[in-house]
């Protein structure tokens, strides 16, 4: 398949701290330095035949290969596929106003059987985003339909999902236009027909800082963003 030049603003991490099943006001900023204490399980929410599902599995393999090559034991966990979906309206509204969470969106994330919830939306009115939700110990990754691109290539979906999973692992933006974690409107990507954009040397060092060679998963699901035991989430 030929490479396609696509201009896409990938830089869109938003935060939410939902703690009840009613629409609510939320802090604006995501927790910094998100680090998993265990192996996070992946749950895909989409139709059964969604063309983006293989791209997710490839992106998970990418993020498991990177720590392995660096000598870290950290991995993303098993991937499950649920035919439940999150409405495009809920995702669009949350992306536009992340301080407000609709009950239906909160319940969908809370009930999903996984730690990293990847919602493959049939809507295209928002950019991809990743949102840590410490109160329910989950991370929401929302991916739009890509219908606005006449011939979306597998390289587009694969790299967009991998970019968002980079946030879920704990990385942030950089300004290197040809790297995977470049964020913002200045990133003009020619998506490769095979494989992924690379991580920078600094990002590889950051991964080893977060998940060093002696890193081992612990039984309880706790991450740095969690409140201390015995306090409200």
Where are these regions (language model features)?
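Metzincin-family zinc-dependent endopeptidase catalytic domain
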Residues: 50-168, 172-175
């Amino acid at each position: 398949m030929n490479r396609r030049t696509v201009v896409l603003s990938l830089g869109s991490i938003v935060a939410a701290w939902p703690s009840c099943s009613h629409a609510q006001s939320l802090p604006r900023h995501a927790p910094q330095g998100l680090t998993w204490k265990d192996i996070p399980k992946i749950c895909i929410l989409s139709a059964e035949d969604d063309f983006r599902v293989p791209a997710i599995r490839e992106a998970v393999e990418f993020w498991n290969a990177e720590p392995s090559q660096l000598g870290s034991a950290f991995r993303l966990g098993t991937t499950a596929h649920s035919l439940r979906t999150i409405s495009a309206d809920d995702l669009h509204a949350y992306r536009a106003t992340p301080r407000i969470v609709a009950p239906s969106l909160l319940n969908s994330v809370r009930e999903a059987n996984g730690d990293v919830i990847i919602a493959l939306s049939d809507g295209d009115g928002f950019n991809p985003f990743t949102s840590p939700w410490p109160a329910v110990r989950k991370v929401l990754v929302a991916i739009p339909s890509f219908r606005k691109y006449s011939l979306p290539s597998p390289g587009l979906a694969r790299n967009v999902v991998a970019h968002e999973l980079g946030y879920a692992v704990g990385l942030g933006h950089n300004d290197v236009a040809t790297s995977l974690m470049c964020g913002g409107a200045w990133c003009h990507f020619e998506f490769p027909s095979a494989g992924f954009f690379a991580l920078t040397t600094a990002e590889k060092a950051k991964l080893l800082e977060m998940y060093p060679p002696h890193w081992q998963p612990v039984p309880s699901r706790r991450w740095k963003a969690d409140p201390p035991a015995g306090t409200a989430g």
